[in-house]
């Protein structure tokens, strides 16, 4: 039983990239926070031979006393059948739900590799890549003229989270997000920064705890005025006042991930009818 | 039965962002390609009251003859219980597998909202944000000195897919990816471009069908020499020859998504032992 105490092996087996399988596995395993785990990813396991290679790995680990887990999103009968012979608990993540859907739709699922292809819906894929080009071109206010083409304009002080959020919105959701970095000039004005005036309905404010901002900026430019706690407090206070005056929707990014900030932006776009669903 | 013929409503209900729930739903529904669907996302449904609001929506749609589906990753008993009262097939995506895991680990899962928090593992999150800064700083070869700090260096002609791939690797996987854009000078040399010489083991080549490259570049600079089919054919041919001469791992991006290209890079990093799992 040499395996006791070792992080338990978690195999992620997919006939494609394995991103979905790993997401589900992590969503499940996060509910057992005390368990030490190690992930072993086996993407593109798309035939019985590849599955058998995984089974052999699992057997070797089991023989040395480890207790592997297998999570798979494959829908190929021969791959599933092979995996079921491994000395491990197999989490077949799709099959049971496919059976339920077969009943709902009164038609059999189309099984086999390649069914879930990221580029299958290639119009959606192209719009993601276009949105990414867009976000890169307009990053940090260098593309004022493109505000008119934006789905959303993220407004906030430097390093409040605008760039990661806009890239994430583009890559994951095909949303065209621009940034407007608030700076000294903007705080001396009462109303909106001039380039934003006609796009008020697209604005989304990002705020952040000044101490967190201070830490982030210090990593970038240690000892600078830009990174000082006084400057950070001043900028965040003025930005918050501006957001309040304009009645902008605001998200605090201090302890939010890009996924969470993006979810807030998407919810806003949906509420205002600019995005379906 | 006014609902017949309408795209069928697919509710995505999560106590968090809903990304995992939507990924699973899409992985399942892609096996029924002929079914018209519309997605209705209800993230942050984290208590019985919020769940009841979703149930009311479902009831209204069902009353007008539609047949909604509900996909949920919630693990909160009160939310699940409420959803089960809706006139819709509910796909409870985690519960059954949590029960299996409870048996495997011989301990009960920690249920409730916030269990699956993107920033819970904040070291991993910070490394993703750092990798993103890194990718942005080194995009398109402007950061030669940072090649030493890179996990991988993507090499290819302009618009072969380097930038989206490096951003995706950073945002999703915390991988530090740099780019090296191959240009005229590089093709006149026999060996590696000078800045890359000492980092050969980190190189990953991206190639693309010249006609596809021509189409992409034409969108960007119509009628230019840069976009001409002759120039595209020349560059791709010379790049491929260079990759072959150096024995680099190469991925054809012509009909691959960033997810797929990234999976190829990750597989390489794992094979060479530079990345666990």
UniProtKB/Swiss-Prot annotation, chains A, B:
Answer yes or no on keyword Iron-sulfur: no
Q: Where along the chain is ADP bound?
A: 156-163
> Mind listing the UniProt keywords for this protein, alphabetically?
Kinase, Nucleotide-binding, Serine/threonine-protein kinase, Transferase
User: What EC numbers are recorded for this enzyme?
Assistant: 2.7.11.33, 2.7.4.28
What Pfam families would the database entry show? Answer: Kinase-PPPase
| Keyword Transferase among UniProt keywords | yes
UniProt cross-references to InterPro entries, sorted A to Z: Kinase-pyrophosphorylase, PSRP
Judging by the UniProt lineage, the source's domain of life is Bacteria
Q: Which GO terms describe its molecular function?
A: ADP binding; ATP binding; phosphotransferase activity, phosphate group as acceptor; protein serine/threonine kinase activity
What this protein catalyses is: [pyruvate, water dikinase] + ADP = [pyruvate, water dikinase]-phosphate + AMP + H(+); [pyruvate, water dikinase]-phosphate + phosphate + H(+) = [pyruvate, water dikinase] + diphosphate
Q: What does this protein do?
A: Bifunctional serine/threonine kinase and phosphorylase involved in the regulation of the phosphoenolpyruvate synthase (PEPS) by catalyzing its phosphorylation/dephosphorylation.
Annotated family: Belongs to the pyruvate, phosphate/water dikinase regulatory protein family. PSRP subfamily.
Protein's recorded name: Putative phosphoenolpyruvate synthase regulatory protein
**What organism does this protein naturally occur in?**
Deinococcus radiodurans (strain ATCC 13939 / DSM 20539 / JCM 16871 / CCUG 27074 / LMG 4051 / NBRC 15346 / NCIMB 9279 / VKM B-1422 / R1)
């Amino acid at each position: 039983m040499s395996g006791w105490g070792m992080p338990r092996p978690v195999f992620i087996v997919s006939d494609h990239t394995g991103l979905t399988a790993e997401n589900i596995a992590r969503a499940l395993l996060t509910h057992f926070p005390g368990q030490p785990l190690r992930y072993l990813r086996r993407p593109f396991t798309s035939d019985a031979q590849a599955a058998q290679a995984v089974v052999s790995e699992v057997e070797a680990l089991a023989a040395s006393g480890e207790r592997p887990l297998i999570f798979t999103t494959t829908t190929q009968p021969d791959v599933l059948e092979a995996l079921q012979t491994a000395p491990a608990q197999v989490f077949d993540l799709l099959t049971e739900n496919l059976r339920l859907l077969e009943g709902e739709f009164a038609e059999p699922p189309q099984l086999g590799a390649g069914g879930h292809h990221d580029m299958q819906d290639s119009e959606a894929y192209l719009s993601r890549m276009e949105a990414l080009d867009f976000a890169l071109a307009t990053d940090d206010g260098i593309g004022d003229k493109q505000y008119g083409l934006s789905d959303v304009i993220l407004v906030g002080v430097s390093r409040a989270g605008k760039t990661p959020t806009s890239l994430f919105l583009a890559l994951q959701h095909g949303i065209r997000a621009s940034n407007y970095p608030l700076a000294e000039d903007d705080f001396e004005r009462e109303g909106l920064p001039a380039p934003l005036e006609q796009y008020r309905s697209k604005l989304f404010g990002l705020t952040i705890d000044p101490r967190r901002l201070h830490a982030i900026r210090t990593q970038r430019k240690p000892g600078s005025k830009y990174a000082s706690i006084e400057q950070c407090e001043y900028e965040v206070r003025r930005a918050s006042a501006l957001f309040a005056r304009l009645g902008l929707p605001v998200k605090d990014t201090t302890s939010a991930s890009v996924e969470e900030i993006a979810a807030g932006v998407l919810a806003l776009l949906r509420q205002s009818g600019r995005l379906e669903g």
